Amino acid sequence: MVLSDKKFVLVTGGSSGLGFETIKALIQTNQPYHVFLGCLFPDEGQSAVLSLQRDVPETPSTLESILVDVTDDESIDRCFHTVQSKIGHLDVLVNNAGISLQASEIGMREAWNRCYDVNVTGAQIMTHTFVPLLLRSNDPRLIFITSGLSSLTPMSNVYTPTRMTVPAGWPKPEVHPYRAYRATKTALNMVMLEWHWQLREDGVKTWGVSPGFLATNLGASFAGMDGAPPVLPASVGGRLVASVVEGDRDTDVGKIVLKDGEVQPF
């Protein structure tokens, strides 16, 4: 099968966690894909490709690691030109790369700025850069990985996810380690909506995907805390993202999709 017979997908942060499981879910389907596995370092990208090939030895799809640091405009440009020179278009962009940092580890300003740089600005610039390739697809799809922690509706009624009452006094106890992370994901939801409306008339389908609380490096710091939701295998989130790529959630364009056909409130 030649490359032109396949759908072309780029997943940022594809060498581990949800990105890795999304790619695995895609190459387990009957639809032939050529997946660009976005990674920060050549060795980690190649290792992830080999691991996926071992896990899914029989597949109509092909894999290729590609270097992309979403905090580096030159890296994003190099990634774009590599994809452009090889195939000339892109069918699916999955903005998956994300981090969660704590002020207690590196200082508040550094933690918040770096989280916004990766989780919001990085996704914005990746999308802006790759739109010309998406517009050359017959069925362009744009996905932003968000979080249940980003939802304003439940947070306006109760302190989610712990549901605890924070006692008076200062300093406050550590309730959860995700303040910067959740704020960036709320911002990312607006980025998703902006692109949904900007690209709708061009035929680009855009979603936010909220994969649930997964057993990944991102989830490790919250697992077991009071009020923490049950931990799901990362493969559950990967299958959800893959289902959006496959067209199962086309009726929910412009929304934040959850598993089991549900939609997350903004």
From Swiss-Prot:
Its EC number is 1.1.1.-. One of its GO terms (molecular function) is oxidoreductase activity. The keyword NADP applies. Pathway: Secondary metabolite biosynthesis. GO terms for cellular component: cytoplasm. NADP(+) binds at L18, D69, N96, Y181, K185, T216. The active site is at S147, Y181, K185. Signal peptide: none annotated. Short-chain dehydrogenase/reductase; part of the gene cluster that mediates the biosynthesis of the tropolone class of fungal maleic anhydrides. The pathway begins with the synthesis of 3-methylorcinaldehyde by the non-reducing polyketide synthase (PKS) tropA. 3-methylorcinaldehyde is the substrate for the FAD-dependent monooxygenase tropB to yield a dearomatized hydroxycyclohexadione. The 2-oxoglutarate-dependent dioxygenase tropC then performs the oxidative ring expansion to provide the first tropolone metabolite stipitaldehyde. This is Short-chain dehydrogenase/reductase tropE. It comes from Talaromyces stipitatus (strain ATCC 10500 / CBS 375.48 / QM 6759 / NRRL 1006). The gene is tropE.
